[in-house]
Amino acid sequence: MASLNKMQLIGNLGADPDIRYMQDGTPTVTVSVATTDTWKDKDTGNKEEKTEWHRVVFFGGLAEIVGEFLKKGSQIYVEGALRSRNWTDKEGNKRYTTEIMAKEMQMLGKKQDNNKVGNARHGDALPADEDDYYDF
């Protein structure tokens, strides 16, 4: 049976991107992207909103573009796939996270200073061995 793992977000960066490099030299950026849902409360008539934070990981050329052209508050469109991973931290605690592995990105909103690239696509966002994609 066929399946689909595709995420699409339009949101704002919660912090300035920080480019890091894997052992093989591949650039990577992990950012938190905020999305906000708004609705009218049917009992009070008040406008309500809820913000969700999404971890998004960029690799290679996409990571370089995000690191160079985006900053806290930048609005972006991201398309990618959900990936979950777990690990044991330095204190021995079992940790778990779910992230969006970005395959496409488009900058939205106001034009940033030095913003020369409007959208980008990365044909193979993950390294060949996914188990190694966080080795720094």
From Swiss-Prot:
One of its GO terms (molecular function) is single-stranded DNA binding. Residues 4-109 form the SSB domain. The keyword DNA-binding applies. One of its GO terms (biological process) is DNA replication. CDD domains: SSB_OBF. Residues 109-136 are annotated as: Disordered. Keywords: DNA-binding, Plasmid. GO terms for cellular component: nucleoid. Residues 127-136 have a biased composition (Acidic residues). Gene3D superfamilies: Nucleic acid-binding proteins. InterPro entries: NA-bd_OB-fold (IPR012340), Primosome_PriB/ssb (IPR000424), ssDNA-bd (IPR011344). It comes from the Bacteria. Homotetramer. PANTHER family: SINGLE-STRANDED DNA-BINDING PROTEIN. This is Single-stranded DNA-binding protein 1.
